[in-house]
Amino acid sequence: ELSVALYRHLLGLPEGEGSRDEPGAGQDLNLLCCDIDAELIERARSSSPFPASISFAQLDIMDSGAREPLLSSHLRRFGRAAFDIGFCMSVTMWIHLNHGDSGLVAFLAFLASLCRYLLVEPQPWKCYRAAARRLRRLGRNDFDHFRSLAIHGDMAARITEILTKDCAMDLVCCFGSTSWDRSLLLFKAKGWNPEDREPLERGCD
């Protein structure tokens, strides 16, 4: 599971080592992992070696009525107004295809308003075309918004433009490409420093 591997990586724990309750496992790192797939979440929850530190929740992130109470409650548990970092891995395309240009912008605005740092792995445009082809081969209709998307082409550049120009974030680093030819982009909230614990009041203009 990516979430467990990420937790181990952030704490420098070797594969297969212990649990969250063991000394040295890291007392201040807690992850909240969300996915729309309830079965996937249940499987991850039942197999997690760090149940005290990694929380799993089934969530449609585009459902504001569901996300607000869940995320606010999680932050209150730790007396925080925002997440230190958000990881958005291979998600942007699905948000974009199912909710259109406005949905993608709203999604990025929401993440920017709630995260001090944000690591994004945008799927390139060729993945959009491949997803549409797979759907057609299955005899199903195109994604509702695929043919009407005005945000297209170099998706890493377009997402960077949205976050930096409209959502009060700075691009800190591009970590190159993954084995799937996807960029890893790290953004930081403008004007924030590690000592700042005040609420973030930001979003896309």
Segments predicted by a language model, with ranges:
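Conserved SAM-binding loop of SAM-dependent methyltransferases across substrates and taxa
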Residues: E1-G26
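Conserved SAM-binding motif I beta-strand of class I
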Residues: N30-D35
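Conserved SAM-binding loop
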Residues: A44-R45
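Conserved SAM-binding strand-loop segment of SAM-dependent methyltransferases
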Residues: F50-L70
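A short, conserved alpha-helix within the catalytic core of class I
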Residues: R67-S72, W94-F110, L114
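A conserved beta-strand element that flanks and buttresses the S-adenosyl-L-methionine
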Residues: F87
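Conserved beta-strand signature within the Rossmann-like core of class I S-adenosyl-L-methionine
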Residues: L108-R129
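Conserved Class I S-adenosyl-L-methionine
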Residues: A109, A131-S177, L185
